[in-house]
A protein has these predicted regions:
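Short hydrophobic/aromatic beta-strand micro-patches
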Residues: 9, 54-56
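Long, low-complexity, Ser/Thr/Gly/Pro-rich intrinsically disordered segments that act as flexible linkers
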Residues: 94-102
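An amphipathic, aromatic/His-enriched active-site/gating alpha helix that lines ligand/cofactor pockets
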Residues: 20-38, 56-95
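Active-site-flanking beta-strand signature of metal-NTP-handling nucleotidyl enzymes
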Residues: 3-8
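Absolute protein N-terminus
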Residues: 1-2, 103
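Short, surface-exposed ligand-recognition loops at beta-strand->loop->(often short) alpha-helix junctions
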Residues: 9-20
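A short beta-turn/loop motif at secondary-structure boundaries
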Residues: 41-47, 87
């Protein structure tokens, strides 16, 4: 099992809108059987205004299929697009980390 962390460093004052988008995305993922994301914000760290979205995936192949929207209905794809519309305006910098869960 893999742990995928999407780390978004938001622009000043844009953490709350990014959290709201992430929570809506998590609910939609759960609704469509893709699992839920865990959403976290920083209390202290290397950079301020950080939002972390964590999810689990059985394999890189499964994660890749999810990112491509394979098996998703057209309506679900449109819902995802609507939720994430404009998120680039909220984010200054981002990265993805992938870990193997050992126990």
């Amino acid at each position: 099992m893999l742990l995928i962390r999407e780390i978004m460093h938001c622009k000043p004052g844009k953490v709350r809108p990014m959290v709201e988008k992430s929570l809506a995305m998590s609910k939609l993922m759960d609704k469509h059987g893709m699992g839920r994301m865990r959403i976290s914000t920083d209390l202290a760290g290397e950079r301020y205004w950080t939002v972390v979205m964590e999810m689990e995936s059985p394999s890189l192949g499964d994660f890749d299929k999810m990112m491509k929207g394979e098996g998703m209905t057209e309506d679900a794809g449109k819902e995802f697009e609507k939720i994430m519309q404009g998120y680039h305006d909220l984010v200054d910098f981002g990265r993805r980390e992938i870990f193997r869960i050992e126990g």
